């Protein structure tokens, strides 16, 4: 039998056949890759892609790590709840009792520090499980968002931790409990319940705003457990209304993680799961959406200067590709980002992935000194001292 000649036509035909098979295989692999479910919480609003990452701006701050010395030589745990005292000098912090929960601890989680880091007051032992957000009202009262209840392991170790958490607590300047919003130890919907409240803000007129819920940032689509909202209460705790829901559009949230108000009375919401700030009237009408401050965990606005401090503890290639963790400082009136402080070096990855560590809560004293509460992998407090700001 004669063998066929290896003509150019035969070779070309074989090449086309092989190329066709390879193309089909690559197409199938690509389709399979697209079919893989997105990492929980990784999907972002479409408008997010239009914002170029801002990672390279001047840093006018000197960083002081390990700020603050706790009583009895105890170590700091995770800290996200930080706010400046009514005097503009002292800073309040909610330490998660040396670890990441106070459910089995007997120490005071709420501590008041002077500018040198000395604790001058503390309270809250046995009352708070997971201090997550904090605000100080015009009378010096301390409001704490306690964002979870004790888990099964913690309850087995300390049964008295039952019936606590998922609430907003109002304390007097001396640490006396004055008011409880929500039903302790239970999750649900307002007006009687919260579901892992992130933060609380008291407006100048006394209206109470609560950002709820924490876990929504890890969900990619709506469902029975996908909740996100801002709830409003009268100064005496009477429920007014809730606004917002889970989603990616303007006026929707995926975990309203931190709240702030500017000198015009506009409500700023750090919508962390959607990597943006949303701005509202005090009645909940949506005004604007900003993506230039990254994936914000903590938000603070100086009421006199409208300087905006946005701290990002989570950005990495999984959850906010192209952006880096850090502190971004800008103007709440114009939206311009002016300064950037990069994350601390860390050989350990954060809970979200990626290396580096930056605070989750942020506040500023009357001299412009910035204080950050660190959740991990570095914990405790950090102080940023302005050196080069005109």
Residue ranges and their predicted role:
Residues 1-14:
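N-terminal secretory signal peptides that target proteins for export/translocation
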Residues 2, 32-38:
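Long, low-complexity, intrinsically disordered N-terminal extensions of eukaryotic proteins, enriched
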Residues 5-7, 29, 134, 178:
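A detector of low-complexity, intrinsically disordered, Ser/Thr/Gly/Pro/Ala-rich segments
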Residues 9-12, 20, 176:
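A periodicity- and composition-biased signal for non-globular, repetitive helical segments
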């Amino acid at each position: 039998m004669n063998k066929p000649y290896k003509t150019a036509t035969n070779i070309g035909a074989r090449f086309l056949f092989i190329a066709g098979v390879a193309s089909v295989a690559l197409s199938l692999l690509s389709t399979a890759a697209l079919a893989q479910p997105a990492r929980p919480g990784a999907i972002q609003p479409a408008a997010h892609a239009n914002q170029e990452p801002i990672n390279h701006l001047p840093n006018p701050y000197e960083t002081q790590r390990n700020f603050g010395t706790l009583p009895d030589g105890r170590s700091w745990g995770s800290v996200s709840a930080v706010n400046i005292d009514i005097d503009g000098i002292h800073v309040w912090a909610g330490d998660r009792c040396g670890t990441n929960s106070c459910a089995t601890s007997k120490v005071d989680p709420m501590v008041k520090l002077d500018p040198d880091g000395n604790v001058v007051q503390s309270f809250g032992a046995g009352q708070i499980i997971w201090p997550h957000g904090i605000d100080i009202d015009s009378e010096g009262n301390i409001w704490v968002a306690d964002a979870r209840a004790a888990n099964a392991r913690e309850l087995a170790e300390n049964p008295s931790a039952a019936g606590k958490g998922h609430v907003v607590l109002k304390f007097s300047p001396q640490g006396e409990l004055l008011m409880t919003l929500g039903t302790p130890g239970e999750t649900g919907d307002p007006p009687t319940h919260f579901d892992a409240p992130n933060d609380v803000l008291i407006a100048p007129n006394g209206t109470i705003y609560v950002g709820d819920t924490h876990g929504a940032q890890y969900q990619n689509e709506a469902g029975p457990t996908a909740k996100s909202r801002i709830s409003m209460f009268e100064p005496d705790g009477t429920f007014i209304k809730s606004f917002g829901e889970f989603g990616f559009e303007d006026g929707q949230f995926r975990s309203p993680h931190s709240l702030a108000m500017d000198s015009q009375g506009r409500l700023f919401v750090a919508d962390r799961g959607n990597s943006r700030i949303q701005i509202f009237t005090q009645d909940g009408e949506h005004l604007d959406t900003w993506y230039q401050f990254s994936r914000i965990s903590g938000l603070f606005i100086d009421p006199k200067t409208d300087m905006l401090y946005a701290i990002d503890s989570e950005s990495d290639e999984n959850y906010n590709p192209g952006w880096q963790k850090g502190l971004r400082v800008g103007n709440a009136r114009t939206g311009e980002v002016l300064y950037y402080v990069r994350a601390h070096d860390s050989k350990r990855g954060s809970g979200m992935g990626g290396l580096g560590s930056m605070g989750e809560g942020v506040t500023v004293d009357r001299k412009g000194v910035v204080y950050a509460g660190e959740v991990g992998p570095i914990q405790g407090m950090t102080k940023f001292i302005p050196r080069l700001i005109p």
